[in-house]
Amino acid sequence: MTSALLNRLNLYPHAAHALLGLIAVAHVLTLWFALNASWLEWMIAVACWFITGSLGMAIGFHRLLSHGLQTSDRCRRFLIWCGCHAMTGPPISWVAIHREHHRYSDTPLDPHGPEHKGKAWVQLFSMYHKPSIKYAKDMIRDPYLTQWQKHYFSYHMALIVTGIVLTMATGSMVWLALHAVPAVLTWHTGSLVNSFGHSEHGAKDSHFISMLSWGEGYHQLHHQNPKAHVFLGKNAPFDVSGLVIKGFINKDAR
C-alpha cells in the first residue's frame, strides 16, 4: 500500500481535530436532549447506546477487529457498522491506537495511560492521538474498512446536521437519541476504562465500570489475555458483551 493512500486513510491531525469537533457538537446536542427528552426518547437513546457501545465498540472494534474474534462476514460487517456510529474514530485508526496501547501499556508511550497523561485528559481526549498504521496493517487490506476510514467524518457530519434539522423541524428529540446521545454515552463510558481502569500497578478490574461499558471494565483480565473475547463467571459477572457473543455471535468464543 502506497504512502499516499496511507496518508489519505490517516489524515492526522485534521482527522483528530474533526473527531473532537464532532464529539463537542454531540455534547451540546446531548445537553439539549437531556433538557427536553421524554422517557420514551431516553429509552431509545439507551437502546442505541447498546448498539454503538456493546455491539459496535466492545464487540466490533475491540474484540473482533483489534483482537480477532471470529464470526461470519455478514455479522462482522454489521458489528463494524454499529461501531462506526459511535463517533470514537474511524475503524483502522481506532484499532491502531488500541493495539499501540497494548504495546506500551502503562508507559510514557501509552496513547491513553492515565498515570502519564492524567485521568481528566484521558477521559476527554483518549482518542486524540496520531495512529501508527503499522499496528493495523491487516486492516488496510479490507476495502469495507478503508471506505469507512475515508468517509467517516463526512458521514458523521451529515448525520449531525440531519439530526439538528429534523429535531428543529419536528420538535422531536428522537433524532438526537439515534446518534448524538449514544455517541456521547459511548465516548465517556469507554474512556472510563482507560481513565479509571488503572492503578499505580497497571490495569485493574471494575464491576462498576463494566456495568457502564457493557463489560469492558475487566481491564486487568483483558490485559492478561488480550485474545480472550468473553469474560464471564464470578470474577466478571457484568460482561454483557461477552453474553451477547456467546449467545448470538460465536458460541465457541473463549
Outline where the language-model segments fall.
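Non-catalytic, topology-defining segments of multipass membrane proteins
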Residues: M1-S191, Y218, A228-R254
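Glycine/small-residue-rich hydrophobic helix-like segments
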Residues: N194-D239
